[in-house]
UniProtKB/Swiss-Prot annotation:
Function noted in UniProt: Specifically methylates the uridine in position 2552 of 23S rRNA at the 2'-O position of the ribose in the fully assembled 50S ribosomal subunit.
A GO molecular-function annotation: rRNA (uridine-2'-O-)-methyltransferase activity
Keywords attached to this entry: Cytoplasm, Methyltransferase, rRNA processing, S-adenosyl-L-methionine, Transferase
Name recorded for this polypeptide: Ribosomal RNA large subunit methyltransferase E
Localization, UniProt: Cytoplasm
Organism classification: Bacteria, Pseudomonadati, Pseudomonadota, Gammaproteobacteria, Thiotrichales
Active site: 161 (proton acceptor)
Family matches, as Pfam families: FtsJ (PF01728)
GO cellular-component term (any): cytoplasm
UniProt family annotation: Belongs to the class I-like SAM-binding methyltransferase superfamily. RNA methyltransferase RlmE family.
Catalytic reaction list: uridine(2552) in 23S rRNA + S-adenosyl-L-methionine = 2'-O-methyluridine(2552) in 23S rRNA + S-adenosyl-L-homocysteine + H(+)
């Protein structure tokens, strides 16, 4: 199949996707909103007054839901390389999470406070080389985990998108070293053919 045909098929599948249609109907920013809603329904991670960091936030599908869960007295900082339209109650940083400059801006907003939950829907820009793309994905996951274990409250939580493949099992072992309970969850709103799942880690050992 040619690249043009592949792109055309993706557009057709995307525009007829149930969750895309529902997101449009409900005014959600993306189908990803349903994923974080499913995660909350199953694990009840987000509570009033919590401090949350959302990595890989654009276009804001997770942030627009989580900010409702934590209420007006909660705090949510979102970060992404891409622009994101403002969301009431969300502080946004545009920058590359792997850069020292962006990391420093994030730390300034955190202001030495401990975080209740770090959520990450980060994924690399795909090159088409599966081996390279998977390695870059695992690298982002390692950065997110390092950030979480540095900044979380004791008993805090961590949620991140993982693509099944080389390095994913080893990554889960790393997560288990720092959290009391680690589970894998594939939301119904994930595309069936996608290799993605979410690692949900609770009870940060501190």
């Amino acid at each position: 199949m040619s690249k043009g045909s592949t792109t055309k098929k993706w557009i057709q599948d995307h525009t007829s996707d149930y969750y895309v249609l529902q997101a449009n109907k409900l005014g959600y920013r993306s189908r990803a909103s349903f994923k974080i809603i499913e995660i909350q329904d199953k694990y009840n991670l987000f509570k009033q007054n919590m401090f949350i960091i959302d990595l890989g936030a654009a276009p804001g599908g997770w942030s627009e839901q989580v900010v409702k869960f934590i209420g007006n007295n909660g705090k949510l900082i979102a970060l992404d390389l891409l622009e994101m339209a403002p969301i009431a109650g969300v502080e946004f940083i545009q920058g590359n999470f792997s850069s020292d400059e962006t990391y420093e801006r994030l730390n300034q907003l955190i202001n030495d406070k401990k975080i209740d939950c770090v959520i990450s829907d980060m994924a690399p820009n795909l090159s088409g080389n599966k081996t390279s793309d998977q390695a870059r994905s695992i690298h982002l996951l390692e950065l997110a985990l390092d950030f979480a274990t540095t900044n979380l409250n004791r008993n805090g939580s961590f949620v991140a998108k993982v693509f099944q493949g080389q390095g994913s099992d080893e990554y889960l072992k790393l997560v288990r070293e720092s959290f009391n309970k680690v589970t894998q969850f594939k939301p119904k709103s994930s595309r069936p053919k996608s290799r993605e799942f979410y690692v949900v880690a609770t009870g940060f050992k501190g």
